[in-house]
Amino acid sequence: MPRYYPVFIDVTERTCVVIGGGAIGQEKVEKLLESDAEVLVISPVVNQKVRDMADAGQVTWEQREYKPGDLAGAFIAIAATDDNKVNRQIAAEAQERNVLLNVVDVTHLCTFIAPSVARRGEVTIATSTGGASPALARTFREKLTGSRILEYADLAPVLASARAELREASLVVKPDHWQTQITEELLDMVQAGQTDEARKMLMDGLMEGASPVAAS
């Protein structure tokens, strides 16, 4: 089994091809749209939700079977078909064109796999089992989604603001000291709407460990 390199990919305004228009294809399309991709769906038949997205101009739908050449100009491609022959053809073209490819539930044909994702605010936590057990990855996601730990995502705006202020002042704080300031008390204050007080407490704590950026 490959040892996958974990990475987040910016697909904004990039052409992403989804081959297949059933429930799984629909799920892939929706996730790509959430990331502002330009989505092309190729399938002779699509479900109503995909059809509605096409009618609304959210995606481009070509109502036909896949044919070689369909991945020209694609940034990534997703094969959501149950046709092994077609999947192999898509994989061959993707390899030839250096297009990143996910073939749903056919790990050995993939050059990337889609993790199970838990999101809150600006924080995204992706979990993968390398294709060994998607059910286990979903279990991680569900447990994270219902846990206190994911609520720490609510701190992201305050932490980003503090980071920007330190950068503006040409100050640096070591990672270990940063982590000591990310506390339950800080989270409670932010969730109670005491954002200004939380930010002040955070900055006071960070300044205790801040030092000037070394001259280059």
Task: Indicate where each model-derived feature is located.
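Glycine-rich, highly charged phosphate/nucleotide-binding loops
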Residues: D52-A72
